[in-house]
Amino acid sequence: MNDKLQEEHNEKDTTSQINGFTPPHMSIDFHSNNNSNIIETIGVSKRLGNSVLSELDSRASSKFEFLKDQSEQQYNGDKNNEPKSGSYNINEFFQAKHDSQFGQMESLDTHYTLLHTPKRKSQHAIPQDRSDSMKRSRPSRSIPYTTPVVNDITRRIRRLKLRNSLVNGNDIVARARSMQANSNINSIKNTPLSKPKPFMHKPNFLMPTTNSLNKINSAHRNTSSSSTASSIPRSKVHRSTSIRDLHAKTKPVERTPVAQGTNSQLKNSVSVFDRLYKQTTFSRSTSMNNLSSGTSAKSKEHTNVKTRLVKSKTSGSLSSNLKQSTATGTKSDRPIWR
C-alpha cells in the first residue's frame, strides 16, 4: 500500500524528476549547453539566471584563453623547443601554479603569533648550570686583613697633628686672636642697620624757593629805598585845599629805630601757599552795589562825600515823573523821555 502511494506521488511530482534523477541524488552538469534545466532546478528567474551564466561563461573563456597561451609558452620553454606532445594536460599547469603560490603563502600560526625578538647571546656567555658548578668547585678563600704600611710621610703627619693638639703659649695667643676676630664679626652682625630713607618725601610746595626769596628781597629793597627818599607819605591833594592847609594838617612822622638783630625779611615774607592761593582778582559774583560800597568805604577816610551811582531812567520812572509834574501844575512843552 505504501509503495503504491509513493509511486503515485512520484508521478504527480514533476519538479522532482529532472533528467531521470531523484532529488536526493540530484547532480547538475554546469558544463552542459542546456542552461534552462539548471535554472529550473535552482529556482531562480530565467532572466537573472541567463544574465549571470552568460557573464560567467564570458569571464571563464577569456581567462582560459589567457592561461592556455601562458601554459603553452612555459611548456615550450621547458621542453627546449621539442615537438609538442598531445598528452600534455592543462590541469598539470594549474596544479603547478597552485603549488607554487600555496607554498609562498604564510601559515596562520606564524601570521597571528606575536613577534619576539631573541636576545643576543654574548660570545663569552657561560651557561647557568656550568657557572653554578664552577662556583661550587672553587674553594672559598678568606681575605686576610692587611694593615697599611707606615711610611715617613704618615709619621710626619701624625707628628704635626700631635703638635697642633698640644696646648702651648702660642696656641693660646692664636685662640685669643681668633676669638677676638669672631667677636668683632658678631658685633658687626648684631649692629642694627641704618634706617632706610622714607619712601614718600615731604611736599616742597610749602617751602620757599629761590625765585620767591629773590622777589621778596627785591620788594624789600624797593620799599626801603622809597622810605628813605620820601619819609612823608604823599596824601591825595584835592583841588579845593590850599597849600597852607596842607602844611597845617601834615605832621612830621617820628622815625622808630629798627633793632639790628631783627630781620626785616621775616615781616615782609609771605608763604608760597598764600601767594599761590590768595585771591587777588574780583570774582564774577560781585555786583555794582558791592563795588560802590567798597569805594565809598575807602573814600570816607579822606572825605565825607558819598559817591552814588545814578541808575538809568526807565519808562516807569519817566511816567511817574510826568504824573508828579502834572500834579504840581508845571507844564512842559516836550515829554522828558524824548
Swiss-Prot record:
Organism: Saccharomyces cerevisiae (strain YJM789) (Baker's yeast)
Compositionally biased region (Basic and acidic residues): 1-14, 242-254
Predominant localisation class: cytoplasm
Region (Disordered): 1-29, 67-88, 116-146, 210-263, 284-338
Protein name per its UniProtKB record: Mitotic spindle-associated protein SHE1
UniProt keyword annotations, A-Z: Cell cycle, Cell division, Chromosome partition, Cytoplasm, Cytoskeleton, Mitosis, Phosphoprotein
Any one GO MF annotation of this record: microtubule binding
Annotated Polar residues bias: 72-88, 284-297, 312-330
Keyword S-adenosyl-L-methionine assigned: no
Biased composition (Low complexity): 216-234
Function field: May have a role related to the spindle integrity function of the DAM1 complex, which is essential for proper chromosome segregation. Causes growth arrest when highly overexpressed.
Location(s), subcellular: Cytoplasm, Cytoskeleton; Cytoplasm, Cytoskeleton, Spindle; Bud neck
Family in the record: Belongs to the SHE1 family.
GO biological process per UniProt: cell division; chromosome segregation
GO CC entries: cellular bud neck; cytoplasm; spindle
Superkingdom assignment: Eukaryota
Phosphoserine: residues bearing it: 165
Pfam families: Msap1
